């Protein structure tokens, strides 16, 4: 049956729960429909249990592996009323501490009144042999907790608010959640809960809230600022904030202006003139930006007057490394000797790594304890391999963890407990957002040196800000621009094409070479077929490159040539089903032993084990790539090996993982791969840009194969569209900020 655009309702009783994620409520269940049929239902239905009745609203869909399913958008649930239904409900372990045996005793004693006794008169349960008062209270508390969750879901469902929002609300506020959201539905828009303003607004207006209330306008204002922060902006202009909030909420600009004033007074919002713009910040982003600028300015003004003989030291380092430095690299050494903070930017093959190695050797001569760092695990690993020194992610360096309320990140290293080093060399700086740069600077002692290295022409950070570009454009921080392509890289078509594309030139894609090939495929399905062939047979057989050394990149997650569809194809080709190979389904994804997977959110608490079983540390970070080594249905765990260290995930944690044979260009930043297959086709206009193509090409070390339409490639080269990022760091460094 084809999906219908009109919502469909199915009424029935839960026959079995196949899968349930306790964190996000995603559920797969069998529903005995009232018409006598049985169907598989998927969706966010927290705490679903066999025996309960529900009305699910949604549409039919066909899963490529599991066939026809009903995708539920909402579920209206009713508590069982008859003794038989109550027994089925409790025997299905709906309430922690109650199984089939206890359920039978309860229903035999209290019949259809069992649930009322559980919730309101738990002391009566002690009349049953084996149930103590403490056990009765525990069972009652568990039932009330679930009942409270159900009431919250039902209350929010009145405004068609997603069940996952109810789940987050209850996890965060507990038994107070329903009362809090009834008092102020706009609490749902907070970062911790993550509802859209439209969801909270529908609930509030539906329950009699004034459409011009101060709470409503404040929520809309903060939502607009948070929405823009997700899109990379540190601030937006006052005028744009008034217009956007007015459009979102439907209230006059004057009321929004009053709300801004109130939020400024409360400290939740900061209004300041930035480079001639009347800007409005979320307080946390303003603090991060202001501190970063203040600290960098202080460091930039610190010059070392007692200069060593850099010419002599450079010659000594050249002999040590077996290299001859170009003049630009000697300049990096001179600046690193003279200044507390410097920036180095350059494209592929221009000697950034050589400059890092040279400065590292220089700091050794100066007897400075130097720490190497990068934004991602893959970038840190590459930095270690190229320098022969240990490098860490910024998060691991700063000993990241969760805050006391478990809703935000916290760093153990800060002003009160700074890093015990004399210098930090930070690579891949274009990936660092304003909050992370602020955290690093807070953790550095006042005298600690900082070397910032990166390629300012690559994509900016995913998080707010344009830190590396702002630092370089300010002209305040001593900067070296590496432009000379060295002999080893000069013969590479990958390097030549990258620089040509960065200049806006159209290379001859038909002119294939030893390390670059273009395969023209204008049909998306044929392009996808070609990608699979390259990874499965052509590169392993013809060029002796194993699939483990091949990374497929694409600008987008969607469409036939996007990340999601290609990962399904490559899993089937490179790691198919086999006897003895265990699997675990999670939503629409099947995880299988042997799969290549990526961590997609920071997990600061997960434990890493060495092969001998000893603890290697804690924390797996967004972008880390590993391989599934074991799936254990008995313990409901899945193990992933990351560079020889194994992390074990409970099945409820699998929303932290996704397949990684294919990744988006954005996710590939900071990494380098022996062979890259870049598939370009249909994508959103802001993904088909020169910076995306340039970033993708510069990920390839030895071989680059582009599959797709040359028209799309040339369009990307010509498309310099960059969504302007409202970031005030450059203006602060240049002294262009003041009161609004």
Predicted regions and their residues:
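Conserved helicase motor core of P-loop NTPases
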Residues: 456-618, 629
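Conserved helicase motor core of SF1/SF2 NTP-dependent helicases
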Residues: 358, 362-368, 374-386, 395-403, ...
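Loop/turn positions that initiate beta-strands
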Residues: 51-53, 594, 623
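Pre-Walker A segment
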Residues: 273-348, 354, 360
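Short hydrophobic/aromatic beta-strand immediately N-terminal to the Walker A/P-loop
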Residues: 342-345, 451, 551-553
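Accessory, non-ATPase domains that flank or precede helicase/AAA+ motor cores in DNA-metabolism machines
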Residues: 1-308
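C-terminal accessory regions
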Residues: 503, 611-614, 622-740
């Amino acid at each position: 049956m084809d999906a219908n655009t009109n919502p469909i309702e199915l009424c029935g009783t839960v026959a079995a729960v196949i899968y349930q994620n306790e964190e996000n409520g995603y559920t797969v269940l069998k529903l005995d429909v009232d018409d006598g049929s049985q169907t598989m239902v998927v969706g966010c239905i927290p705490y679903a249990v066999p025996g309960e009745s529900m009305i699910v609203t949604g549409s039919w869909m066909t899963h490529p592996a599991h066939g026809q399913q009903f995708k539920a958008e909402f579920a209206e649930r009713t508590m069982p009323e008859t003794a038989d239904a109550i027994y089925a409900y409790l025997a299905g372990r709906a309430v922690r501490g109650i199984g089939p045996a206890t359920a039978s005793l309860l229903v035999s004693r209290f019949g259809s009144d069992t649930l009322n006794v559980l919730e309101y008169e738990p002391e009566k349960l002690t009349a049953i042999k084996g149930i103590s008062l403490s056990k009765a209270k525990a069972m009652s508390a568990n039932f009330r907790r679930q009942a409270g969750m159900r009431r919250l879901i039902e209350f929010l469902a009145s405004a068609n608010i997603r069940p996952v929002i109810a789940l987050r609300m209850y996890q965060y506020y507990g038994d107070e959640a329903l009362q809090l959201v009834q008092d102020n539905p706009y609490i749902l828009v907070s970062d911790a809960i993550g509802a859209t303003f439209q969801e909270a607004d529908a609930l509030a207006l539906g329950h009699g809230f004034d459409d011009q209330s101060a709470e409503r306008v404040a929520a809309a204002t903060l939502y607009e600022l948070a929405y823009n922060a997700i899109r990379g902006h540190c601030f937006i202009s006052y005028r744009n904030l008034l217009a956007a909030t007015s459009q979102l909420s439907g209230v006059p600009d004057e009321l929004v202006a009053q709300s801004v004033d109130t939020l400024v007074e409360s400290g939740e919002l900061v209004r300041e003139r930035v480079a001639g713009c009347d800007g409005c910040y979320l307080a946390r982003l303003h603090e991060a930006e202001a501190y970063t600028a203040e600290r960098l300015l202080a460091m930039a003004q610190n010059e070392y007057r007692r200069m060593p003989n850099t010419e002599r030291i450079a010659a000594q380092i050249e002999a040590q490394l077996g290299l001859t430095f170009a003049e630009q690299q000697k300049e990096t050494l001179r600046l690193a000797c003279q200044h507390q903070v410097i920036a180095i930017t350059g494209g592929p093959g221009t000697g950034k790594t050589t400059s890092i190695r040279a400065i590292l050797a220089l700091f050794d001569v100066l007897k400075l304890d130097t720490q190497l760092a990068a934004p991602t695990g893959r970038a840190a690993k590459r930095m270690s391999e190229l320098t022969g020194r240990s490098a860490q992610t910024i998060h691991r360096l700063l000993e990241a963890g969760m805050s006391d309320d478990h809703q935000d990140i916290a760093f153990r290293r800060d002003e009160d407990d700074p890093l015990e080093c004399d210098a930090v060399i930070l690579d891949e700086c274009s990936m660092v957002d304003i909050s992370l740069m602020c955290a690093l600077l807070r953790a550095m002692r006042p005298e600690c040196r900082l070397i910032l290295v990166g390629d300012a022409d690559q994509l900016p950070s995913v998080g707010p800000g344009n830190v590396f570009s702002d630092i370089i454009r300010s002209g305040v921080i001593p900067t070296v621009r590496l432009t000379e392509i060295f002999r080893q890289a000069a013969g590479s078509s990958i390097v030549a094409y990258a620089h040509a594309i960065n200049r806006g030139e159209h290379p001859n894609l038909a002119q294939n070479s030893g390390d670059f090939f273009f395969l023209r495929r204008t049909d998306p399905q044929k392009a996808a077929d070609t990608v699979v062939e390259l990874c499965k047979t052509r590169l392993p057989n013809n060029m002796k490159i194993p699939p483990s050394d091949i990374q497929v990149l694409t600008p987008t997650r969607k469409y036939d040539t996007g990340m999601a569809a290609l990962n399904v194809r490559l899993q089937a080709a490179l790691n198919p089903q086999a006897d003895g190979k265990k699997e675990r389904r999670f939503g629409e994804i099947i995880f299988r032993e042997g799969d290549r997977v990526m961590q997609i959110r920071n997990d600061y608490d997960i434990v890493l084990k060495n092969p001998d079983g000893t603890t290697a540390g804690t924390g797996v970070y967004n972008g880390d790539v590993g391989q599934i080594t074991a799936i254990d249905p008995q313990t409901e765990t899945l193990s992933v090996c990351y560079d020889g260290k194994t992390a074990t995930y409970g099945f409820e944690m699998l929303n932290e993982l996704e397949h990684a044979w294919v990744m988006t260009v954005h996710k590939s930043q900071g990494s380098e791969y022996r062979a890259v297959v870049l598939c370009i086709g249909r994508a959103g206009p802001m993904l088909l840009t020169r910076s995306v193509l340039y970033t993708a090409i510069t990920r390839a070390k030895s071989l680059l194969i582009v599959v797709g339409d040359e028209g799309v490639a040339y369009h990307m080269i010509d498309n310099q569209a960059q969504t302007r990022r409202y970031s005030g760091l450059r203006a602060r460094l240049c002294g262009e900020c003041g009161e609004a």
